[in-house]
Amino acid sequence: MTDYSSQGACVLTTGQRYNNLYKMLDKNSKIYVAGHNGLVGSAIWNNLMGRGYTNLVGRSHKELDLLDPVAVKKFFDEEQPDAVVLAAAHVGGIMANLNYRADFIYQNLQIQQNVIGESYRHGVKKLLFLGSTCIYPRMAPQPMKEEALLTSELEYTNEPYAIAKIAGLKMCESFSLQYGCNYIAVMPTNLYGPNDNFHLENSHVLPAMIRKVYLAKCLNEGDWDAVRKDINLRPVEGVDGSRSNEEILTTLAKYGITPEAVTLWGTGKPMREFLWSEEMADASVHVLLNVDFKDTYKPGDKEIRNCHINVGTGKELSIREVAEKVVAEIGFRGELRWDASKPDGTPRKLTDVTKLHNLGWHHKIEIDEGIHRLYEWYKKGICINHKS
């Protein structure tokens, strides 16, 4: 068992803690963004660069396996970052969470253990951990305040992932309380944006909707060239554009995509909140640069807990409404159907963003503009990858 008490620059007397560690990062600070190629990590990277923080470090999964403790230690030994943004995680939609429960809890716990542990041992000044609002109970009072954490049962479909993320935020909280570290956890709502995951096997709700409706539109219009370009870029169950029309139709039909209709999971009734990923990045960088752990709880609290920060819009709409907006944006003339035999997930998920607002950040991009931006980004990506 590791004895942390004799390691790391966070071990300070009470009087030293905030004076020594709670300092603003300057533009020469070396910042490691774990997961810098992902949806949020890439947006955080770009946001930092745009603010003049250019001493950034990133590694692809091929270059650095965050599940490997030896490799992670070697990376920290060599790079000695001043700050860390932990945006790397094993993520997926309802189907993936149901089918690969062990992967979701094991891999996320291992990533967090390795990165947070080495950050402590190497005296990292500031760490920002990205979680998810799935940490809250299935029937949490709405909108969900940070204080709702661990008050009742979690949603079954993503329970392993949620437990891993709860462990991550509690690691940040506990290291900060015991050792005086400056580790903060932020819990974003449903995110979407550039570099999103559009693979039908494991994508989240909004990118999955956009791709399904787009492919159905192409089939409806008989545009097989567009269909083949799409699945050449992102094959579905190994099926790409070289296959026959019949094989492609059979495979897409498994995911509710036909020329006549798009069929989505559930009833469409659950209420959800969506935040543009570049705004999540802006909120994250705002917290990284301007908020310290001591700002996340009330002075004088005897029991300090729930120090994480919700990040969202504070606005919600039903999955059905989102789907209808996607259909309208893309211009699909077929039917939109719902398979009520499939799970809906949590009935309602809306964050209370009062703490975030009090810390000085508000969102700007609304859902209609976001859907338009994401669809344009998706189409542009297909075109770029098929230039002759």
PLM regions: where:
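C-terminal substrate-binding subdomain of Rossmann-fold SDR/epimerase-dehydratase oxidoreductases
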Residues: 20-21, 28, 35, 39, ...
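NAD(P)H-binding glycine-rich loop region in Rossmannoid oxidoreductase-like domains
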Residues: 69-109, 118-121, 133, 138
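Conserved Rossmann-fold NAD(P)-dependent oxidoreductase catalytic core, especially the SDR/UDP-sugar
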Residues: 113-159, 184, 197
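Active-site Tyr-X1-5-Lys
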Residues: 114, 156-189, 205-221
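SDR active-site strand-loop-helix element
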Residues: 34, 59, 84-90, 127-133, ...
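Adenosine-cofactor binding site in Rossmann-like domains, unifying the SAM/SAH pocket
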Residues: 49-74
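Short-chain dehydrogenase/reductase
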Residues: 105, 109, 157-169, 199-207, ...
